[in-house]
Amino acid sequence: MSGFLPFSRPAMGVEELAAVKEVLESGWITTGPKNQALEQAFCQLTGNQHAIAVSSATAGMHITLMALEIGKGDEVITPSLTWVSTLNMISLLGATPVMVDVDRDTLMVTPEAIEAAITPRTKAIIPVHYAGAPADIDAIRAIGERYGIAVIEDAAHAVGTYYKGRHIGAKGTAIFSFHAIKNITCAEGGLIVTDNENLARQLRMLKFHGLGVDAYDRHTWGRAPQAEVLTPGYKYNLTDINAAIALTQLVKLEHLNTRRREIAQQYQQALAALPFQPLSLPAWPHVHAWHLFIIRVDEQRCGISRDALMEALKERGIGTGLHFRAAHTQKYYRERFPTLSLPNTEWNSERICSLPLFPDMTTADADRVITALQQLAGQ
């Protein structure tokens, strides 16, 4: 048997090593010029006006919710089929996450489900661009505008995703992730884009102790050695070491996503003859970033359960992922919302499995996964 094929592996090369070396030798290794360059690059990529680099997408979500003054008594609409950090940040601020169902086959939250969940207490809507495909953000944003509710796009899966000809985050507010498995990575990191100047100003303060400027700003422009606290804030800034890696990865984005697309197409062709069900593609015009390739494993249809399939693939030296176990089925949220029923979310949460997908995979690697799936399907 070949060596273990992981579910994901970052595509790092000599360029990233050189970028880190440059920062280490520069004498300025924390937040500085590489952060500024990364923010400018994301404004250029998305077409949005402001970009704020942070230590993680979770940190970005936290301070965005804070800047919108979301707290006790407020409600925030979000799918349950998302990473739990979104629910956690809402809860930690004292607000109530209002979890809604998703489309059964795209796993996208729908405008209809969002609008049905709105109450006088609704303060924000957080749609997820899932697995690298875009949600119907025009329709969702129109709901937000009609009711005067903020829309925060969870774009953690969407670096390189386009919706109706525009990159995700082209307008409004969106949060990207540079976590180790994402389409571009710097190990840990995130970035917020927004067209709201006041929100951008608040986010810059909240990410760095509530100060009006960061350490590099003060050092470079000769400002007062101790800036004044304008509001209580956090330590969510990104180091230039991380930013330099992210910048280098961003240069490679088209190549990295092209390779992801090729592997996804290889899977799609093979799955046409297998009982495992891939996700449907959104009906609206889009470019898929293929952050994840997900199949649904229905035991009656496939002759094997999802958990048994994942274990069998592991025994064959193939890693898989689960994105995600529905938040409302996990202990804290299950006990907090014991009567919540989301049929499409629950059906998928019990069946979804993420296959290996990363740019350094070879055609032979994908063939190995396909052969294993064929064997497990009895073919």
UniProtKB/Swiss-Prot annotation:
The keyword Zinc-finger does not apply. Its cofactor is pyridoxal 5'-phosphate. Pathway: Nucleotide-sugar biosynthesis; UDP-4-deoxy-4-formamido-beta-L-arabinose biosynthesis; UDP-4-deoxy-4-formamido-beta-L-arabinose from UDP-alpha-D-glucuronate: step 2/3; Bacterial outer membrane biogenesis; lipopolysaccharide biosynthesis. Keywords: Aminotransferase, Antibiotic resistance, Lipid A biosynthesis, Lipid biosynthesis, Lipid metabolism, Lipopolysaccharide biosynthesis, Pyridoxal phosphate, Transferase. One of its GO terms (biological process) is response to antibiotic. It catalyses: UDP-4-amino-4-deoxy-beta-L-arabinose + 2-oxoglutarate = UDP-beta-L-threo-pentopyranos-4-ulose + L-glutamate. It is an enzyme of class 2 (transferase). The modification N6-(pyridoxal phosphate)lysine is found at K182. GO terms for molecular function: pyridoxal phosphate binding; UDP-4-amino-4-deoxy-L-arabinose aminotransferase. Its EC number is 2.6.1.87. The keyword Lipid biosynthesis applies. GO terms for cellular component: membrane. InterPro entries: ArnB_NH2Trfase (IPR022850), DegT/StrS_aminotransferase (IPR000653), PyrdxlP-dep_Trfase (IPR015424), PyrdxlP-dep_Trfase_major (IPR015421), PyrdxlP-dep_Trfase_small (IPR015422). Catalyzes the conversion of UDP-4-keto-arabinose (UDP-Ara4O) to UDP-4-amino-4-deoxy-L-arabinose (UDP-L-Ara4N). The modified arabinose is attached to lipid A and is required for resistance to polymyxin and cationic antimicrobial peptides. Belongs to the DegT/DnrJ/EryC1 family. ArnB subfamily. Homodimer. This is UDP-4-amino-4-deoxy-L-arabinose--oxoglutarate aminotransferase. The gene is arnB.
